Amino acid sequence: MAFTRSIALFAGLALAASSAQGATILGGYTQKNATSDDIELLTQATSSANMYNKNVDTRICLIAIENLETQTVAGTNYKFQVAGCPVETDDELGACDDRNCDYSSYNIVIFSQPWSDTIEVTSITPAEYQG
């Protein structure tokens, strides 16, 4: 039930946060409009602590998708910029229950390799604004 709620939440938010797709840069990140599959990947990966790389110690819940870029490697790196709130326990991962929390922007990088059934949150860092 919570998974379905999260998908519905992010589907609406992705429409508001979509941007034009850019040209592919070899080895670099490319802008991408978030699809329902991308939202499902984000929700699945960030809701389960066992999908986090052991070096990722930042834990957040998610409010909105602000941006998405992808990079083709030996699989795909998805760099989601999200609005989220820090959480204390793994039970709070996924969509934020308290949508009035003091949120910030974060970059979440998820590595996906479908043919080996690999999904891993490789980093969560505060987003840096370029201005």
From Swiss-Prot:
Entry keyword Phosphoprotein: no
Positions occupied by motif Secondary area of contact: 71-75
Gene Ontology cellular component terms for the protein in this record: extracellular region
Site positions (Reactive site): G27
Compartment(s) where it occurs, according to its Swiss-Prot or TrEMBL record: Secreted
Membership in a protein family: Belongs to the cystatin family.
Protein known as: Cystatin-like cysteine protease inhibitor EPIC3
